[in-house]
Amino acid sequence: MAKKKKDLDLASSSHLNQIQGSTNAIFNVIFVILALACIIPVVFIFMISISSEHSIKMNGYQFIPSAYSLDSYKFLLREGQMIVTALGVSVAVTVIGTVIGVALTMLMGYVLSRSTYKLSGFFTMVVFIPMIFNGGIISSYVVNTQFLNLKNSIWALILPLCVSSFNVVICKTFFKTNIPESIIESAQIDGATQFQIFGKIALPLSKPLMATIALFLTFGYWNDWFQSSLYISDTKLYSLQALLDHVQRNIEMMANNPSLGVTTAQYMNSMPKEGARMAMAIIIIIPIACCYPFFQKYFISGLTVGAVKG
């Protein structure tokens, strides 16, 4: 009898493994499709960037160009100083904004997670409301330009994106579910201040969360061009994304302007317009794509803990 039961258990276990194997195969196919959906557009953009302008005009965008050319990258190298300046602005904004954003977000999340803080519920609601309603572009523009005087300032690219309600909620959930009150009470009995508890207990236990918030902020700052379009008119303060938008608009304006002279028109015809746009996009993608693998482990674990347990 026991042997028959054991055989049944083995059979059911084998059947379960077969189901899991087929399910894994389905998920693998789905993930491969999603990965290709992310990779193929980047490869396609790169292939366009190394296509000759004549090939693009004659045949349109092709995954395998009929004629290859590096004229797009040579054209951008001639504007190397502007690109280097924009790269410096992007790096500075991303680094400074990420550091400040992580510090403020972690502090807010920790304070709101403490049940001993009497105003935790009220300020949690204050943080949560902007996730549903916001003041709009006009009010933000008035505050940043007339009250804070951030027009043509690098801080106009940093402060508006510094703290996100979504990130604060993730931090609050993480601290509330992963740092028991008993540990904090023990530290307080030993004479530790709140800043000591935060720095020596909370932060060391929240490295995955910090990496997750840092990645969110890094991607947000690096890919942002909207703040530049609102607050920046000085080309020396353009980020890479803003520079790409600026170059694209200038190319379109010159290409569609019938009042230009013959020499300028000939130059525009010979300039790799489409290829230059794609080459600029590749230059923007490379730095952030190289950073992601180093934080992938922390990103996945931190996002899972912060979001699912809440």
Kindly give the residue locations of the regions a language model identified:
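A hydrophobic, multi-pass inner-membrane permease signature
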Residues: 2-310
